[in-house]
Amino acid sequence: MSDILTKIEAYKREEIAAAKRARPLAELAAAAKTASPPRGFVAAIREKLAGGDTALIAEIKKASPSKGLIRADFDPPALAKAYQQGGAACLSVLTDTPSFQGSLDYLVAARAAVTLPVLRKDFMFDTYQVVEARAHGADCILIIMAALDDAAAQDIEDAAIALGMDVLIEIHNRDELERALKLRSPMIGVNNRNLRSFEVTLATSEALAPLIPADRLMVGESGIFAPADIARLERVGIATFLVGESLMRQHDVAAATRTLLARDSLRTTGTR
């Protein structure tokens, strides 16, 4: 595990312990049962792809450890609506506070504003967090293979599936891919950001995509700023993308989303 993930795990473990004291699992599980039913995250992506469209998971992110504050004018419901109007298939909402200035309240507010399925984007170390995600309306959770051993990843995935949620399994090297393929969830996200150095290169997706079985749903993550980046990854078979920072920095988020997804000559020549 990288140094940054070690630090993150330390504070997340403290957060989880405090959350369990404040709201016991039994109470949280009861809330999860009465939450709005899950919206199919994978199903929404597959519907876009079946129509010949690129599937975008549009991210609501206020800040990041590497870039600091990304968007000062931060209104999750308005951003969610803009992404939906721009053609996104799903949303991703950062809920980690120390590193990303995120909040579960942002997820609740964003989901209430739209009909799109929503991913809780956070560092998951305990099945309590999965129940917490569902209780707040999340339709999908994230498993970062670099942060978990196989047993923990399996437990978290099992908890999510039991609650009717989808799972995005994130990898950034071949070893993590091999471990991810032991899990049941079809969605494999290739993070182009090195979690140790924070360096971003699309070559990561280009190297790993050919190794991912055809029955899995590939997602390109990080380093996607323009239609040319999407076209580059489409050439190795990736048609679903998670994009946050480049869209969050735009004044007109809906227009920027439409532009990113625009099917111009650059993307339609030899890219599919």
UniProtKB/Swiss-Prot annotation:
The protein's annotated pathway:
Amino-acid biosynthesis; L-tryptophan biosynthesis; L-tryptophan from chorismate: step 4/5
- What CDD domains is this protein classified in? IGPS
Species classification: Bacteria, Pseudomonadati, Pseudomonadota, Alphaproteobacteria, Hyphomicrobiales
| Catalytic activity, reaction form | 1-(2-carboxyphenylamino)-1-deoxy-D-ribulose 5-phosphate + H(+) = (1S,2R)-1-C-(indol-3-yl)glycerol 3-phosphate + CO2 + H2O
Q: What is this protein called?
A: Indole-3-glycerol phosphate synthase
Which Pfam families would you find in this protein's record? IGPS (PF00218)
Alphabetically, the GO molecular function entries are: indole-3-glycerol-phosphate synthase activity; phosphoribosylanthranilate isomerase activity
Q: Which GO terms describe its biological process?
A: L-tryptophan biosynthetic process
Which major enzyme category is it?
lyase
Is Amino-acid biosynthesis one of the keywords UniProt gives this record? yes
Give coiled-coil spans as residue ranges: none
Family to which the UniProt record says this protein belongs: Belongs to the TrpC family.
Question: What's the EC number here?
Answer: 4.1.1.48
Key words, A-Z:
Amino-acid biosynthesis, Aromatic amino acid biosynthesis, Decarboxylase, Lyase, Tryptophan biosynthesis
